[in-house]
Regions:
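Charge-dense, helix-prone N-terminal extensions
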Residues: 1-137
């Protein structure tokens, strides 16, 4: 847990104005579909901040921020990978490539995207739906 949650000015200074807009749009899209707990944390070695969407002790996804970069991570477990693989041709090339290049660990595939625009957002929502049905109408 962070002592102080970064404000708009701090986030804009960190990732830049255009990526901060992507961050805001991605958060809005997730919030539109899911009622989740949202937790700010330190981003570990590679990132400055982590912003995690969780409910009932399970993580849906996490957003990450560092200098001039925004990350979106989703972890697909075994059953979720099977669902993705059955439907993979309906995902864009970049999502398929990242899926294929991501190492599989004992607890799943930790897929990290670094969006610079909104072009992958439909695929992100489709991936999130594999993990959990939207709970907002």
């Amino acid at each position: 847990m962070l002592d102080r949650i970064p404000d708009k000015e701090q986030m804009t200074a960190l990732v830049g104005e255009s990526l901060y807009e992507i961050w805001i749009k991605l958060c809005a899209l997730i919030d539109e579909n899911y009622d989740m707990d949202r937790l700010w944390n330190k981003g570990g070695k590679a990132w400055t901040y982590e912003y995690k969407y969780r409910r009932g002790g399970k993580t849906l996804c996490a957003l990450y921020a560092r200098e001039n970069c925004v990350g979106f991570m989703i972890i697909l477990g075994k059953d979720e990978r099977l669902k993705f693989e059955k439907d993979r041709e309906n995902y864009g090339e970049e999502v398929q490539r990242i899926y294929d290049e991501t190492q599989t660990y004992h607890d799943g595939k930790w897929m990290m995207f670094e969006p610079t625009d909104t072009s992958l957002f439909d695929d992100f929502i489709r991936l999130l739906r594999i993990k959990r049905k939207p709970n907002r109408k």
